[in-house]
Each structure stands twice: as C-alpha cells, then as structure tokens.
Design a protein with these regions (language model features):
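Glycine-rich phosphate/diphosphate-binding loops that line cofactor/substrate pockets in enzymes
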Residues: 136-149
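Key DNA-contact positions within bacterial/archaeal DNA-binding proteins
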Residues: 72
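HTH-adjacent hinge/linker in prokaryotic transcriptional regulators
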Residues: 23-24, 36-40, 46, 50-57, ...
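N-terminal intrinsically disordered/low-complexity leader segments
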Residues: 1-35
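Glycine-rich phosphate-binding loops that contact phosphosugars or nucleotide phosphates
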Residues: 146-269
C-alpha cells in the first residue's frame, strides 16, 4: 500500500484515489474536446495537460500562471474533484501516468491481429487489404507525429470520439492531442510544429466549411487525412475504402488508431 504524508505528518493512502484520478483525466479531456466552450475550465484543463509532465517541479502558483488563472480558481477546480492538497494531487497525477504507461505495454503484449486480418481480407479488395496491413504507412505517420509538438484533431465529434483512448495514451507518452473546432469563430490555426489529423470520411466537413483547408494549411503543419478521399495532395492519406458497412469502416479506423499508438510506443519510448 503506497502512502504519502500530509503536512500534519498524518499518512494518506494514495491508492484510494485511483478511480478518482481516472474520472479527473476524463474530465480534462472532456473540457479540451469541447473547443466551442473555452471557459475557465477549458483554460485550466488545457494548461494542466500542457504542463502535467512537469508538475513535480511546479508550485501551485507557477501552475496557475501557466493556466492563466488565479491560484484560488485552480484550488477550487481541484476541490471539485476531491483534491484538497496540491502535493497529494501531484503525487497521484504522476502515479497515474506511470500506471497508464504499464497498461499500454500490457495491451501491446496481449494484442493479436490475426483474426482481424482475416476479417479485412474477406471484405476488402486485395489492393486495399495489402495497403492496410503494409507497415510502411504506420512508420511514416509515427515519424510525423514524433517530429511534432502536438496532434490536432479536426473532424466531427462522432469520429473524434474514436480517438479518446489514443488521446490518453499519447498524453502518457508525452504528446498532447487536442481537438480543434470546425467552426470559424472558434477555430484555432495549427502551428508549424503541429501534426494535424483531418477526419474527413465522406468529405462533408470540407464541403460545408470552404475556409477550413486554407486555415489548416496556413502555417504549413504536418498533415494526415483519414477517410474516403484525399483532400490534400501534400498530406499523408490513410484511406478507408468506400462502400463498406459502417461497422467495417469503424473497424478500419480503430485499426489505424491502434497501429499508430502501439508502433509509436514501441519505437519512440
């Protein structure tokens, strides 16, 4: 049983807050995945995730400055989720990152793609199947991600929801994944050192927002598209063949996400 001391020298059992920390991480990503509402909670969640790997070295005043909020606002945010002492919160946060990293390793060791490959070979054309299982694409995509500061997701809420586990996994591996708005009033322009993943599928998101492609490319970030069409000639395209049942489309999307996550963990950690 792992314990730490409170300021009054009483002992506090860290393991009791494991479930609470899971809920806390879910809340942080919920706030940054709702880019239409950039309120106090959004600023705290984003600032905390941007600086989470440095928490051991930050005082609460320094963290508040980086979140662009007051110390009292930050303390109030922590108390809502049951954390009354910043030192205890920091210990739990760091411990949670280590636990999630071990979980990634366990999932990698237990994963067997043989059955999934059989399903893909039965529903896809031979050229689509060979392209899907060819590992060259995942190497190039992971290299693009590795050489970027952040991953920016642009797409519908429905498609972006598939990336929820990847978002947490990559955060544990030191890479922040942020969902951008698809509306001009709240869209933030990706920076040159970002890697943008455009979830285009049938392309309606592009057809309905004629300004989107130009704004995405404005600072010349690295770009990856996932969907039926490659809207950007200078982007790396991961194709999901047309004419498939929605279940199979989702299976291929999830396959892309898993391969990217596990190869990145194996290659760069």
């Amino acid at each position: 049983m792992k314990k730490t001391k409170n300021k009054d020298n009483s002992w506090y059992d860290i393991s009791k807050r494991g479930d609470t920390m899971n809920c806390f991480f879910n809340a942080l990503f919920m706030f940054i995945n709702n880019p239409e509402v950039r309120d106090l909670n959004y600023r705290i969640a984003l600032g905390l995730l941007e600086n989470g790997h440095e928490l051991d070295y930050l005082t609460i005043n320094e963290l508040a400055e980086r979140c662009f909020v007051s110390t009292s606002s930050l303390n109030r945010f922590f108390r809502i989720y049951g954390y009354k002492k910043y030192m205890i919160f920091k210990a739990l946060f760091s411990s949670h990152l280590r636990i999630r990293y071990v979980q990634i390793q366990n999932r990698m060791n237990d994963k067997d793609y043989e059955m999934l490959h059989k399903v893909f070979s039965s529903i896809l054309k031979s050229e689509d199947y060979e392209r899907l299982i060819d590992m060259s694409w995942v190497k190039e995509v992971c290299e693009m991600i590795h050489n970027s500061k952040r991953i920016i997701l642009i797409g519908s809420d429905e498609m972006a929801s598939f990336f929820s586990r990847m978002q947490t996994d990559f955060y544990v591996m030191g890479k922040l994944v942020i969902k951008d708005s698809i509306y001009k009033t709240n869209f933030f322009t990706p920076e040159k050192d970002d890697c943008v993943i455009l979830l285009s599928m049938e392309g309606r998101i592009v057809d309905l927002n004629s300004w989107l492609l130009d704004k995405m490319k404005e600072n010349n970030p690295k770009m990856i598209t996932i969907g039926h069409y490659d809207y950007l000639q200078d982007a790396y395209g991961l194709t999901i063949p047309q004419g498939l049942d929605e279940v199979f489309e989702n299976m291929i999307l999830d396959y892309y996400i898993q391969k990217i996550t596990y190869y990145y963990a194996e290659k760069y950690l």
